[in-house]
Amino acid sequence: MRFILLLSLPLYALDQLTKRFVLQLISLYEARVIVPDFFSLVNVPNTGAAFGSFRGNNTFFIVISVIAFAVVMFLLIRHRPPDTLRDVSLGLLLAGILGNLTDRLLYGHVVDFLLFNLHVRYADPWPAFNVADSCISIAVVFFIIHSFRKQKSAG
């Protein structure tokens, strides 16, 4: 559990500090180009889910986040053998859930600020996201890898 907190808390702090920086220095919907035609910092409110889908459902996503937080905490305090990949996944997920939940409670929306132009058809630019979103996405990838490893070792 201590290991997970040592991972989660700095990532949560990084998420909140970067969002505070954006809110103080970048006006709503403004873009600050960092690398021309590739990367900008923006200030985009998101009341929906990933990629801005299901907009206008902040209360619903607060409830979902609280439930997800409770499930992750249950999984963390349950006695089970150590598993590094699973524990890293849970730590990343915890940081991401808390980061976006904090935004929803404080601001009424999630603060998205990283905008990449990957020159990919139908995603040009890629939708804005934040550190918490990155933590959640990486956690999902790690969970998938973990489940395949478990299936392979069982079979």
Q: What are the residue ranges of the model-derived segments?
A:
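Alpha-helical transmembrane bundles and membrane-interface segments of multipass inner-membrane proteins
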Residues: 1-155
